[in-house]
């Protein structure tokens, strides 16, 4: 197996071997002709040839040398070696340029195909009022306009949400109520009334002004009231409790912003006008708070 190796001046192994063979051939020709010239010079010096005869002899030697070199040129083409090498380089350059041109055309074709695909998807996502024309510039212009409109809408919604959060104060007292009889969160009040002849339940849809939870243990009641802060609200509630026969044993007040949480520990006296039940006391407490708010 013949391996291709790098030789000086860009020649291959085959070309180098041919060159060596040609050099040997040239050397033999030159040596033989040198001997002929030397013999002729000796004969000239001895025979005193004229200069015209010497010139004719040199011409004949050149012609003879050319005739000997002709078969070698026909066999190896040594005269056209450099021209063939240049031609191969030129042909290689032309092929490389053609390949680059074809690659560039293929890349450009794929790029346009992808661009058209993306534009069709973009157009399908736009409203009809923004995607009427079919040219690429109009589709991109409509998309930009639509995105600007969405951005303005988003900023407006964010401003509304921020204003809503500022207006709505978080109810930090929501965990204080387990089973309230009245709750502003549901805005539903359940009132239980008892008559002297029989007991039955009445569900009324009332205006809930406070969260009220009442827990009864015999004749002692734990009352929690969460409502909007109002001047002299605590004083008015205590006076109403006393008039109903509810003695205040302990109380606690906690405020946060515009809300107040009242915690009462009361005793239902014997002369109390209310039935000692959680629902009855809750109804009365809520009615007291609602009446106090109306007196403002």
Curated annotation (Swiss-Prot):
Keywords: DNA-binding, Nucleus, Transcription, Transcription regulation. Expressed constitutively in roots, stems, and flowers. Its main location: nucleus. GO terms for molecular function: DNA binding; DNA-binding transcription factor activity; protein dimerization activity. GO terms for cellular component: nucleus. Residues 99-150 form the bHLH domain. This is Transcription factor bHLH99. The gene is BHLH99.
